[in-house]
C-alpha cells in the first residue's frame, strides 16, 4: 500500500510530531511518501529514510482578512495543484492529510477518479464563515475523517460525513520517553538548579492559547505564598507569519516583560526550541498545560510516560488523557490563584505526588506507538475496502 502524506507547513509542532511518530510506527507496513514544504519537517522525514516531495504549503489563517485571506487562498490554490500533480505521478492508494489545512489542499486537489482522502483533524478551527466552509468540505468530500480527540471530533457534529468520525488519540514513543534513560539531572545542572529545587515546565509553542502567561502568574502567586519554584518554558514562537491568528513574536516579548513585572524574571527560564524534551520532563516535578483549547495534549502523555504528573486545563483534550486527582490535576483555565493553591497542596504531599507518578506511568502505556500505527493501518484498509 502506498500512502501520500500531506502537511501544509514545514514547521514541526504537535501535529507534525504525531505524524513523524506514525510514519516511524508504520515502517515496513506502508510505502510512505510525504508532501510538505522544505524545512524542518522535510529534514526530519528524510532522516527517517522516507521519500519527500516539496510543495509550497500555506500558513493561511481561518479568519478572514482583507489582505492575508487573498494571499492564503493563492497559496492554497498553488499547493493543491502541486498535490494533484504528485498524485498523478506517484499514484498512491490513499492520501492522508495530516491537518485541517492539509485536508483542504488534498480535497481541492482530488479528481473523481483519484485515491480516497483521509482527513486527520488534529486542530481546533475557530468560528467563522471560512472555517464552516472548510469543515463542511471535509465532511462532504473526505472518504474518512479521523480526529485526535472527541473534543476535536465534536466540530463535525451536525455535519454529514461519509462514515463515522473516528477518534484515534495521538501516540507516545515509549522508547524515547523512558524515565530509565532520560537524565533530568543534566538539565538541572545546565540551568544551575539544585537537585531539591522545585521545577515546573511548560513545553509548547509560544502562542497565547497555550497559556504561558497564566503559568508565569502561577509562579508569581506561588512566590507570594512563600513557595519558590522555577518555571521552564520550552518552545518558540514558531508560527510568525502575518497570516497567523496571533502575533506570536510579540507574545514572547510580552511574556518576558510579564515575568519581570511580576518580580519572577529570575524564576522563569526561556529555553527556546529543544530536542531534549524527555530530559526536560524528567527534570520537572510537574508539567503545566494551561492551554485554553488544547486539541489533544500530546505533551501530557509524554510527561506521564516519564512519570511526571500533569496539571492541565479541564477543557479540550486533556480530560480524555487522564483523570483529575488520579494521574494529575484538571483545573479551570485562566485562574492562577486556583492553580497556585492546588499546586502548593500537591507539592506539599509527597505520598500523593508519588502515587500520581506511578498511575501516570501506567496510563501512558495505553498510548503506545505500535498499537496506534496498527489502528491507523486498519483505518486505511477499511477505507480502501469501501472503494
Spans of model-derived segments:
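Short His-centered aromatic/hydrophobic patch
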Residues: 79, 97-103, 121
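Carbohydrate-associated surface elements
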Residues: 151, 171
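A short helix/loop element that forms part of the nucleotide-sugar donor recognition site in Leloir-type
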Residues: 178-193, 254-255
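Aromatic "clamp/platform" in nucleotide-sugar-dependent glycosyltransferases that forms part
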Residues: 273, 292
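Short hydrophobic beta-strand element within catalytic cores of glycosyltransferases
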Residues: 309-312, 322
Amino acid at each position: 500500500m502506498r500512502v501520500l502524506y500531506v502537511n501544509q507547513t514545514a514547521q514541526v509542532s504537535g501535529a507534525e510530531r504525531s505524524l513523524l511518530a506514525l510514519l516511524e510506527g508504520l515502517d515496513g507496513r506502508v510505502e510512505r511518501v510525504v508532501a510538505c514544504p522544505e524545512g524542518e519537517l522535510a529534514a526530519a522525514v528524510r532522516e527517517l529514510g522516507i521519500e519527500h516531495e516539496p510543495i509550497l504549503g500555506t500558513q493561511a489563517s481561518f479568519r478572514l482578512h482583507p489582505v492575508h485571506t487573498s494571499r492564503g487562498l493563492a497559496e492554497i490554490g498553488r499547493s493543491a495543484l502541486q498535490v494533484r500533480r504528485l498524485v498523478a505521478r506517484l499514484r498512491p492508494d490513499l492520501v492522508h492529510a495530516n491537518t485541517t489545512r492539509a485536508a483542504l489542499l488534498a480535497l481541492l486537489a482530488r479528481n473523481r477518479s483519484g485515491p480516497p482522502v483521509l482527513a486527520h483533524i488534529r486542530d481546533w478551527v475557530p468560528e467563522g464563515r471560512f472555517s464552516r466552509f472548510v469543515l463542511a468540505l471535509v465532511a462532504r468530500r473526505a472518504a474518512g475523517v479521523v480526529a485526535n480527540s472527541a473534543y476535536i471530533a465534536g466540530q463535525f457534529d451536525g455535519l454529514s460525513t461519509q462514515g463515522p468520525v473516528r477518534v484515534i488519540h495521538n501516540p507516545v514513543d515509549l522508547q524515547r520517553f523512558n524515565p530509565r534513560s532520560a537524565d533530568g539531572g543534566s538539565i538541572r545542572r545546565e540551568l544551575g538548579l539544585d537537585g531539591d529545587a522545585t521545577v515546573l515546565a511548560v513545553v509548547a509553542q509560544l502562542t497565547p492559547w497555550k497559556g504561558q502567561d497564566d503559568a508565569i502568574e502561577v509562579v508569581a502567586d506561588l512566590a507570594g505564598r512563600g513557595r519558590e519554584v522555577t518555571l521552564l518554558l520550552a518552545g518558540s514562537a514558531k508560527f510568525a507569519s502575518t497570516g497567523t491568528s496571533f502575533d506570536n513574536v510579540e507574545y514572547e516579548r510580552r511574556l518576558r516583560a510579564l515575568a519581570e513585572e511580576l518580580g519572577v524574571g529570575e524564576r522563569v527560564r526561556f529555553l527556546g526550541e529543544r530536542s531534549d524534551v524527555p530530559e526536560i520532563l524528567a527534570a520537572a516535578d510537574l508539567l503545566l498545560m494551561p492551554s485554553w483549547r488544547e486539541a489533544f495534549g500530546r505533551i501530557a502523555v509524554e510527561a506521564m510516560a516519564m512519570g511526571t504528573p500533569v496539571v492541565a486545563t479541564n477543557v479540550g483534550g486533556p480530560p480524555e488523557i487522564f483523570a483529575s486527582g488520579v494521574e494529575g490535576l484538571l483545573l479551570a483555565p485562566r485562574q492562577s490563584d486556583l492553580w497556585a493553591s492546588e499546586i502548593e497542596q500537591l507539592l506539599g504531599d509527597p505520598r500523593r505526588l508519588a502515587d500520581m507518578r506511578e498511575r501516570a506511568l501506567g496510563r501512558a502505556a495505553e498510548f503506545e506507538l505500535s498499537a496506534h500505527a496498527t489502528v491507523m493501518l486498519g483505518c486505511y484498509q477499511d477505507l480502501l475496502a469501501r472503494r
